[in-house]
């Protein structure tokens, strides 16, 4: 249990000012709150100077508490490195953050907002987060943590991307010739049940194969007792299910409302086509990130493609842990691995040993909850290598800086920058008009 291995401290911090999309909040100036958990290992003795601070990001609609068994395994398997703390925040519209913000949230969501929220959180708690920092993200959280690295290239020493949603092609959208997908399921699914027990039974398919530790957290944190703003009338819900009014059984709904999960998965583009002329015109005030070539499609999601296109510039080293049976486009993800960090500003990529891909055959997208030990062990091997490199780099930096002045530039500046001539040539007036 995480409480046996970690001291867990909860925080509520403000989100970043001005959201990416004006429709993310009821009023554009609304201040959102971000619910944060800080997991600090219970240990005897001082914390080593090079102990890692992890910044973690979750998948769409998945409570951050589901990842606690993964933190337990990382701590148990850690060898060649130490853990200072693990920090994880719920996205503003999801889980505990969503509950705190439910009177301010509206029907839009940008993944970029959480990257900015995390940067704000890191600055807020900077005194507790000395280097090295390591980012770890699952699913759309892998995309978000990558964008945080784009925002601040030297922030992270390395990234651990667990089946990240970084690809060029959109998912199946369930219209035209597309088969229904997770997006269709999210919109049309049931989202209220007469009891927690009934909710667990109804959702057993998504819980199938989960580690018992994750399953326990799923039953506690994935559902929420009524009333909620979406379902304020408990008696009406009881009547719908034929439950007596005096019953002590409490109806439940999803902790993250399905509509917030939906708009995080996909974004609407319903107004690009002029109803009078039939012409497609991108409404740039609200949809500037829409590719004009595909603006005829009524749904889109910009971040997977835009993040993929910047992979060459990714500065921190990166481990890609890919689920062999993922529903994502695995071929495109692997193409991303090939170019990751290979361009100007990047880490050097695969050729320099700064990027590695590990495919776990047979594992699905929810592998952090189903194969906890294996996923943790894969990350540990990479962290051992990267921490050895970090220590070597730090030692070399200190040696190179030893004895240097911090008040004046070194002699090489005077060798490279030639002095300005002291004499002035007589000015000619021949060129005057």
UniProtKB/Swiss-Prot annotation:
EC number assigned by the record: 3.1.1.-
Reaction equations catalysed: mycophenolyl-CoA + H2O = mycophenolate + CoA + H(+)
Assembly information from the UniProt record: Homodimer.
Signal peptide: none
Gene Ontology molecular function, alphabetical: hydrolase activity
Any Gene Ontology biological process: terpenoid biosynthetic process
Pfam families from the UniProt entry: Abhydrolase_6 (PF12697)
Species this chain originates from: Penicillium brevicompactum
Protein name: Type I acyl-CoA thioesterase mpaH
Enzyme type, top EC level: hydrolase
Location (main, coarse): other
Lineage: Eukaryota, Fungi, Dikarya, Ascomycota, Pezizomycotina
S-S bonds: none
InterPro entries, per database record: AB_hydrolase_1, AB_hydrolase_fold
Family: Belongs to the AB hydrolase superfamily. MpaH hydrolase family.
UniProt key word Hydrolase: yes
Free-text function comment from the UniProt entry: Type I acyl-CoA thioesterase; part of the gene cluster that mediates the biosynthesis of mycophenolic acid (MPA), the first isolated antibiotic natural product in the world obtained from a culture of Penicillium brevicompactum in 1893. MpaH acts as a peroxisomal acyl-CoA hydrolase that converts MPA-CoA into the final product MPA. The first step of the pathway is the synthesis of 5-methylorsellinic acid (5MOA) by the cytosolic polyketide synthase mpaC.
Record localization: Peroxisome matrix
GO cellular component: peroxisomal matrix
């Amino acid at each position: 249990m995480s409480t046996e291995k970690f001291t867990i401290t909860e925080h509520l911090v403000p989100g970043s000012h001005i959201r990416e999309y004006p429709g993310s909040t009821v009023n554009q100036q609304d201040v959102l709150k971000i619910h944060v958990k800080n997991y600090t290992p219970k240990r005897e003795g001082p914390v080593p100077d090079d102990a890692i601070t992890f910044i973690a990001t979750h998948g769409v609609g998945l409570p951050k508490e589901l990842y606690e068994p993964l933190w337990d395994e990382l701590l148990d398997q850690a060898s060649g490195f130490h853990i200072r703390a693990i920090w994880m925040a719920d996205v503003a519209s999801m889980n505990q953050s969503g509950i705190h913000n439910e009177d301010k949230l509206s029907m839009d969501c940008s993944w970029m907002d959480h990257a900015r929220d995390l940067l704000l959180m890191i600055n807020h708690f900077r005194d507790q987060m000395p280097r090295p920092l390591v980012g770890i993200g699952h699913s759309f959280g892998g995309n978000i943590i990558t964008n945080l690295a784009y925002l601040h290239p030297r922030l992270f020493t390395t990234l651990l991307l667990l089946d990240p949603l970084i690809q060029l092609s959109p998912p199946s959208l369930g219209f035209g010739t597309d088969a229904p997908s997770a997006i269709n399921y999210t919109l049309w699914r049931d989202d209220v049940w007469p009891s927690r027990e009934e909710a667990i039974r109804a959702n057993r398919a998504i819980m199938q194969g989960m580690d018992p530790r994750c399953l326990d957290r799923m039953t506690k944190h994935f559902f929420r007792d009524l009333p909620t703003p979406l379902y304020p009338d408990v008696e009406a819900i009881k009547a719908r299910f034929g439950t007596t009014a005096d019953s002590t059984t409490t109806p439940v709904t999803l902790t993250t409302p399905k509509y917030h999960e939906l708009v995080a998965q996909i974004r609407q583009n319903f107004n690009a086509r002029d109803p009078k002329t039939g012409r497609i015109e991108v409404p740039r005030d609200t949809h500037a990130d829409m590719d004009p070539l595909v603006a005829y499609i009524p749904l889109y999601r910009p971040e997977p493609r835009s993040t993929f296109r910047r992979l060459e510039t990714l500065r921190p080293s990166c481990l890609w842990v890919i689920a062999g049976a993922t529903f994502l486009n695995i071929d495109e993800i692997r193409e991303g691995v090939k170019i990751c960090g290979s361009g100007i500003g990047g880490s050097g990529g695969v050729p320099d040993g700064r990027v590695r891909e590990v495919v776990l055959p047979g594992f699905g997208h929810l592998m952090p909850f189903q194969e906890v030990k294996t996923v943790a062990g894969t990350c540990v091997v990479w962290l051992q290598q990267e921490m050895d490199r970090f220590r070597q780099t730090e030692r070399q930096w200190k040696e190179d800086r030893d004895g240097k002045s911090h008040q004046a530039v070194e002699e090489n500046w005077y060798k490279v920058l030639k002095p300005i001539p002291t004499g002035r040539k007589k000015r000619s007036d021949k060129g005057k008009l």
